[in-house]
């Protein structure tokens, strides 16, 4: 858990260091969240190092989600979290990921397995791959 938050903090700090003005990172984050993520949407070529901030936010959000539902932080779950963070540079943001997470979480309530089972957690996190 601490490792994931450290990686997230690293992404956020890198975006603040690499960007000239700190206000532009937050302004770019608002712009990133307004993007639809339709192919091609390379956030790095559009927003530069501000996309690292988006990667850190997605990593923190997905880790907190797993902890909130009492899911296990095992290998596949951490891989799914890194997948979310990685695609934060190419089309994925909170605005297009949260509706999918909510929808799959609601769908898991009528399924056989619990919402915090490893299979369901990995399905929820990888379903955000539909977002970009």
Q: What are these language model-derived features?
A:
Residues 1-132:
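Alpha-helical multipass membrane-protein architecture
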């Amino acid at each position: 858990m601490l490792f994931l938050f450290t990686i997230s903090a690293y992404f956020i700090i890198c975006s603040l260091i690499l960007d000239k003005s700190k206000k532009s990172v937050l302004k770019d984050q608002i712009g990133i969240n307004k993007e639809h993520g339709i192919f091609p949407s390379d956030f790095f070529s559009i927003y530069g190092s501000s996309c690292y901030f988006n990667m850190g936010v997605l990593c923190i959000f997905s880790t907190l989600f797993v902890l909130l539902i009492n899911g296990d932080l095992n290998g596949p779950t951490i891989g799914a979290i890194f997948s979310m963070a990685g695609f934060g540079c190419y089309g994925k943001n909170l605005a297009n990921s949260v509706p999918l997470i909510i929808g799959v979480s609601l769908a898991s309530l009528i399924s056989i397995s619990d919402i915090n089972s490893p299979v369901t957690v990995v399905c929820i996190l990888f379903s955000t791959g539909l977002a970009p």
